[in-house]
């Protein structure tokens, strides 16, 4: 049986390494063609666009961490509204570009009053989660103060308090890419 850490290592790290190698090779090969006078001028101009596309992909977090991007989940599986019982913090998200009734799903690290050693422990059992409905162009997020946690495997850093959310597009089943809001508490 695979646990979440094994899935993370096997799928995500392999994906990150593969994409990094492909993008690195693309940029190096394109630079070689661009800087070599033996190649046709049209090809050399074309590789400028290839380099630009590779750089744009490198700058997007979803390129390396695809689970943060657009995804699909049948909207009937998402509760209408849910607030963590006893949540004591409230944040308002401007959703004026979305119609009233649009749902957002949100989640934050658990509250333990300690720095948590890894993301899997930080979100364990997903106790600090909810679903909010847009009303008058705003969505209210109610959570407990999330703890800071460490990400040691890739970035080796301490992440400050924050919560994530996705917008639910009911008609299509799409969920927006993950968005993050920093929290002061």
Which sequence ranges carry the predicted segments?
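N-terminal signal sequences
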Residues: 23-36
């Amino acid at each position: 049986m695979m646990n979440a850490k094994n899935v993370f290592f096997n799928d995500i790290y392999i994906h990150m390494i593969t994409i990094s190698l492909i993008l690195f090779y693309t940029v190096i090969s394109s630079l070689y063609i661009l800087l070599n006078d033996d190649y046709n001028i049209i090809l050399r101009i074309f590789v400028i666009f290839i380099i630009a596309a590779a750089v744009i992909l490198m700058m997007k977090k979803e390129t390396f961490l695809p689970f943060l991007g657009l995804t699909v989940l049948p909207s009937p599986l998402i509760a209408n509204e849910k607030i963590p019982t006893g949540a004591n913090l409230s944040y308002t998200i401007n959703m004026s570009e979305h119609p009233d009734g649009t749902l957002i799903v949100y989640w934050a690290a658990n509250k333990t009053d300690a720095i948590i050693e890894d993301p899997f422990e930080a979100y364990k059992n997903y106790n600090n989660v909810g679903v909010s409905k847009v009303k008058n162009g705003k969505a209210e997020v109610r959570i407990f103060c999330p703890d800071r946690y460490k990400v040691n495997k890739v970035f080796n850093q301490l992440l400050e308090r924050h919560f994530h959310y996705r917008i639910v597009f009911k008609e299509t089943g799409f969920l927006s890419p993950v968005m993050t809001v920093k929290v002061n508490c």
